[in-house]
Amino acid sequence: MADIAVPLTFTDAAANKVKTLISEEENTELKLRVYITGGGCSGFQYGFTFDEKTNDGDLIVENSGVKLVVDPMSLQYLVGGTVDYTEGLEGSRFIVNNPNASTTCGCGSSFSI
């Protein structure tokens, strides 16, 4: 069986934070869902939520025993990107490094293609 390239990277830092949050919720069925919606100052914005289920066509990326889930519509905007977790002066948050974004807003939560 040939290896299939995963179109989205789920970093160790993000996976470890998800693992911690799932442990706090005491629900091992939870997965981090990343999605794109219209809005924000640049046209599209990233969203993050926890979800117990997956839907037909969802991409599932696993790291350290936890799962990142992306729906097919959102995935087309995220191919080649990285979902990471950062802690700094601006606070702690999940972030998306998206090579498809032509512009991003200052807070990094919205982008345009």
From Swiss-Prot:
Its cofactor is iron-sulfur cluster. It comes from the Bacteria. GO terms for cellular component: cytosol. InterPro entries: FeS_biogenesis (IPR000361), FeS_cluster_insertion (IPR016092), FeS_cluster_insertion_CS (IPR017870), FeS_cluster_insertion_RrpA (IPR023063), HesB-like_dom_sf (IPR035903). GO terms for biological process: iron-sulfur cluster assembly. Binds 1 iron-sulfur cluster per subunit. PROSITE patterns: HESB. Homodimer. Required for insertion of 4Fe-4S clusters for at least IspG. Belongs to the HesB/IscA family. This is Iron-sulfur cluster insertion protein ErpA. It comes from Histophilus somni (strain 2336). The gene is erpA.
